[in-house]
């Protein structure tokens, strides 16, 4: 089941989400795309839509 892992890129102050089944995979994707991502929690699809964040 796909989850939305919520991150903050400390370097830019940008919040974003990674859609994946595994936190480890999500962290790897976050580190590939951002300089200093910090995991903040898990969101559901509705919360991601409301926030309007980029999803990777």
State where each predicted segment sits.
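Short aromatic-glycine-(Arg/Gly/Cys) micro-motifs in beta-strand/loop hairpins
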Residues: 1-14
């Amino acid at each position: 089941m796909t989850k939305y892992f919520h991150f903050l890129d400390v370097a830019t102050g940008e919040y974003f989400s990674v859609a994946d089944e595994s936190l480890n995979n999500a962290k790897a994707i976050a580190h590939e795309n951002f300089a200093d991502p910090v995991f903040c929690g898990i969101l559901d699809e509705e919360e991601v839509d409301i926030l309007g964040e980029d999803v990777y």
